[in-house]
Design a protein with these regions (language model features):
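Short hydrophobic-aromatic micro-motifs
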Residues: 46-47, 95-97, 104-113, 173-177, ...
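Short glycine-rich loop/turn motifs
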Residues: 79-83, 107-108, 159-161
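Short, solvent-exposed loop/turn segments at secondary-structure junctions
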Residues: 102-103, 117
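Short acidic, gly/pro-rich beta-turn/loop elements at beta-sheet edges
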Residues: 106, 185, 245
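Catalytic alpha/beta core of large soluble enzyme barrels
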Residues: 116-223
Length: 253
């Protein structure tokens, strides 16, 4: 259950200690007011994700205030999905976690966390490394709360010199580094499906990236089509065309 991990943390430059996200206010330590930066440190962790289902189901039998129980369930999280490997023109592989592998044909870009370790290995391959390094430094001074705020302006830097390869279409797609992707969540890399995720749609619109409809319905020229059930019909998706989302998900695994 317990293990050690090298991970990105909030580091107070004055207290010389790790801070929880709640202890970082507007980029400074709530206790001393000093600047907080991101550092990679060895931390003791609990493997909560391996017990997510048990922990969430166990909350139903506890005499908790409903609000507290809901907060606990949201914090633990329950997610059923798959890891997908994307090749790159650098010869490396990027792994993402997704609950919607049926939308792979609609992936038009990828995004890496500024702390993703693969970026350092690509330093000599990226023609705009100085821009990437400057963006990473800027992100290091933001809290995870600031970075993951849904309504914040989307920022990022496109990597010049390395592309990813969509495993479904075999086409090269651009890779960005953006601070809304956190190294502490998932693999630190996400796939962009702008036709069916609103945050991806906003990012793609800002950077002029293709938006492909792979689940029929809605008007993706105006916003992402985010049908919540699994009855949608697949389009522009090769062998998945005509299937429902429900049937397409297991067909892609």
């Amino acid at each position: 259950l317990a293990y050690k991990k090298e991970m990105n943390v909030n580091w107070c430059t004055s207290c010389k200690c790790v801070l929880a996200n709640e202890e970082v206010v507007n980029g400074v330590c709530e206790r001393c007011g000093s600047e907080v930066v991101h550092r990679v440190k060895s931390q003791s962790m609990l493997k909560i994700t391996a017990y997510a289902d048990k922990l969430i189901d166990g909350l139903d039998g506890l005499d908790y205030i409903e609000r507290v129980a809901t907060q606990q369930k949201n914090w633990i999280g329950r997610s059923h999905g798959a890891e997908v490997n994307f090749g790159t023109t650098a010869g490396d592989t990027l792994t993402v976690y997704t609950t919607r592998c049926d939308t792979l044909f609609g992936v038009t870009y990828m995004v890496l966390s500024p702390e993703h370790p693969i970026l350092d290995t690509w330093k000599d391959k990226l023609t705009n490394w100085d821009d990437v390094a400057a963006y990473r430094e800027e992100a290091a001074h933001k809290s995870d709360f600031e970075r993951s705020e849904l309504n914040k302006d989307k920022t990022g830097v496109r990597l010049e010199g390395v592309c990813a390869v969509n495993p479904a279409t075999k086409e090269e797609i651009p890779i960005f580094v953006s601070d809304y992707v956190l190294m502490s969540y998932g693999t630190g890399a996400v796939m962009g499906v702008p036709g069916h995720d609103q945050r991806d749609w906003e990012f793609a619109t800002k950077f002029g990236l293709p938006i492909i409809e792979v689940v029929q319905g809605g008007d993706i020229t105006k916003e992402a089509f985010t049908l919540k059930d699994d009855t949608g019909i697949m389009v522009n998706s090769g062998f998945l065309n005509g299937m429902t989302v429900k049937d397409a998900i297991p067909a892609m695994k």
